[in-house]
């Protein structure tokens, strides 16, 4: 394990480890201020869908609710910024709780889970029973009829645009993004969380869009007649004024979390499931497309962007 000078640094280190490896990051902290110092790191992991398990200490069960030294309701504090959290009252429940925490952190849309353990439970003795590794819950497949509808929308489009977020990295779907873009002759833009999913060397890749992004990516998104959005939540950094966002485009929104569909931008079609699987199936369903006028316009925008950046 790695000891840090401050718990906030430990939380961000666990977050960074999870981003770099795809594995669950783990952070441990003492009760009271140690636990509350984790909050910013936990919130970061929650908003960016990063798998993390935070394990905190607390006062003994007998002192809970008495405003004891370094007693903090850390489960209550972190409820809005965790996928789930646990307060372990009995030693008999500890092993299964930790296993479940790791399962929740990696299942579906990843995120942080907190396990709060009172001091008397930490000091208790109990016979450990080995158990199989708990795998993440499987993601249900998308209905074929919805995939067929998406394929029909793609084939009807004249100016398609692929817009990807961090889900492309989480689901290791970069190759599927590139394959679909080639199949439907579309440019690729991304959110900040989607950077590195597609290499900058790909001629279709326009970079990050939005207020902090590239001109070509933002303008082409607003000129598109179909936006295929996958693994992102349409945050305000990318959309700007939602009433004026891509007014001429139909939208297909793909996300593993159904609650993200239609939340910020209404979609003409929402698909809930694995981004990698959905894009792979769409590649099989759509016919090869050619959009020479659209791609010529994309090249114009890329050239103008390069000119702006050179100034």
Where are these regions (language model features)?
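Anionic-ligand anchoring segments at beta-strand to alpha-helix junctions in alpha/beta enzyme folds, i.e.
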Residues: 1-15, 28, 142, 149-227
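Thiamine diphosphate
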Residues: 1-61, 216-235
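Conserved thiamine diphosphate
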Residues: 23, 69-108, 223-224, 269, ...
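Short internal beta-strands
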Residues: 54-56, 114-116, 185-192, 252-255
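Glycine-rich beta-alpha junction loops
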Residues: 59-60, 117-122, 166-168, 195, ...
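Conformationally flexible catalytic loops at phosphate/diphosphate-handling active centers
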Residues: 72, 100, 104-156, 295, ...
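Phosphate/pyrophosphate-binding active-site segments
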Residues: 92, 130, 248-311
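Phosphate/diphosphate-binding loops
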Residues: 210-261
């Amino acid at each position: 394990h790695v000891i840090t000078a401050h718990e906030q640094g430990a939380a961000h280190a666990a977050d960074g480890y999870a981003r770099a490896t795809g594995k669950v990051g783990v952070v441990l902290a003492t009760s009271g201020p140690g636990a509350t110092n984790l909050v910013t790191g936990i919130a970061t992991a929650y908003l960016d869908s990063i798998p993390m398990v935070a394990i905190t200490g607390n006062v003994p069960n007998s002192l809970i609710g008495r405003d004891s030294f370094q007693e903090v309701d850390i489960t209550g504090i972190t409820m809005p910024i965790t996928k789930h959290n646990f307060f372990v009252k009995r030693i008999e429940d500890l092993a299964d709780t930790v296993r479940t925490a790791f399962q929740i952190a990696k299942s579906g849309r990843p995120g942080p889970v907190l396990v709060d353990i009172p001091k008397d439970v930490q000091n208790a003795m109990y016979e450990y029973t080995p158990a199989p590794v708990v795998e993440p819950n499987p993601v249900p497949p998308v209905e074929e009829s919805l995939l067929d509808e998406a394929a029909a929308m793609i084939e009807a489009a004249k100016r398609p645009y692929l817009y990807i977020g961090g889900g492309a990295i989480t689901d290791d779907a970069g190759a599927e993004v590139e394959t679909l873009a080639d199949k439907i002759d579309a440019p690729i833009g991304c959110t900040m969380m989607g950077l590195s999913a597609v290499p900058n060397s790909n001629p279709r890749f326009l970079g990050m869009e939005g207020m902090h992004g590239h001109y070509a990516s933002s303008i082409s998104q607003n000129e598109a007649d179909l936006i295929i959005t996958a693994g992102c939540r349409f945050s305000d950094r990318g959309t700007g004024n939602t009433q004026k966002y891509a007014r001429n485009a139909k939208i297909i929104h793909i996300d593993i979390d159904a609650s993200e569909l239609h939340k910020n931008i209404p979609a003409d079609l929402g698909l809930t499931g694995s981004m990698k699987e959905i894009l792979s199936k769409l590649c099989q369903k759509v016919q090869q497309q050619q959009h020479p006028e659209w791609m010529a316009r994309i090249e114009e925008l890329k050239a103008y962007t390069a000119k702006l950046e050179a100034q």
